Amino acid sequence: MSKVLFVKANDRTAEEAVSVKLYEAFLNSYKENHPNDEIVELDLYRENPPYLGRNAINGTFKAGKGMELNEDEKAAAAVADRYLDEFVKADKVVFAFPLWNFAVPAVLHTYVDYLSRAGVTFTYTPEGPKGLMGDKKVALLNARGGFYSEGPMAAMEMSLNYMKTVMGFFGVQDLHTVVIEGHNAVPDDAQKIIENGLAEAKKLAASF
């Protein structure tokens, strides 16, 4: 039995957002095909994690060094530890997120900030940083209304590329992606584009 963490970074409904359609399609297919796995859903907009700042940075640093924390640092470090522990303990992690203004939603960036901790998800070596999450399986589900996989807009895609870079930095080797793109650029083909992407997500979930 695997422990699977589903992370959703969009507070719109499935009727409003393609990335939420992707999330629900993958989740439902996964549940159907892996009925014995333990699933944890993390809705980042519902969680509304505070931005990474002084108290969290100082608190986690001091805790790692065995130093005394003040009350604000303890509270901030506890939040950071909770998200990090949940991620580390998961055998598989699924992220669903849109491309907004060329990047990930701020709430997802904040969440990733909490995951990036030396000595846990990566470590420093004389040869450079080394990821420590090599045994984790990750799926990235991304939706963007325009075409960003190639052509002049490719250099402006900092959503999926950001998440792929972070997961690679963490040492994740078993990385899968499903992307739905162009449904706003070509509205006449939108339904077909979305349906094909959802079918791909369901297929991946069945074997994930």
UniProtKB/Swiss-Prot annotation:
It comes from the Bacteria. Keywords: Flavoprotein, FMN, NAD, Oxidoreductase. The keyword Repeat does not apply. InterPro entries: Flavodoxin_fold (IPR003680), Flavoprotein-like_sf (IPR029039), FMN-dep_NADH:Q_OxRdtase_AzoR1 (IPR050104), NADH:quinone_OxRdtase_FMN_depd (IPR023048). It catalyses: 2 a quinone + NADH + H(+) = 2 a 1,4-benzosemiquinone + NAD(+); N,N-dimethyl-1,4-phenylenediamine + anthranilate + 2 NAD(+) = 2-(4-dimethylaminophenyl)diazenylbenzoate + 2 NADH + 2 H(+). Binds 1 FMN per subunit. Gene3D superfamilies: 3.40.50.360. GO terms for molecular function: electron transfer activity; FMN binding; oxidoreductase activity, acting on NAD(P)H as acceptor; oxidoreductase activity, acting on NAD(P)H, quinone or similar compound as acceptor. It is an enzyme of class 1 (oxidoreductase). Its cofactor is FMN. Pfam families: Flavodoxin_2. Its EC number is 1.6.5.-, 1.7.1.17. The keyword Acetylation does not apply. Signal peptide: none annotated. Homodimer. Quinone reductase that provides resistance to thiol-specific stress caused by electrophilic quinones. Also exhibits azoreductase activity. Catalyzes the reductive cleavage of the azo bond in aromatic azo compounds to the corresponding amines. Belongs to the azoreductase type 1 family. This is FMN-dependent NADH:quinone oxidoreductase 1. The lineage of its organism: Bacteria, Bacillati, Bacillota, Bacilli, Bacillales.
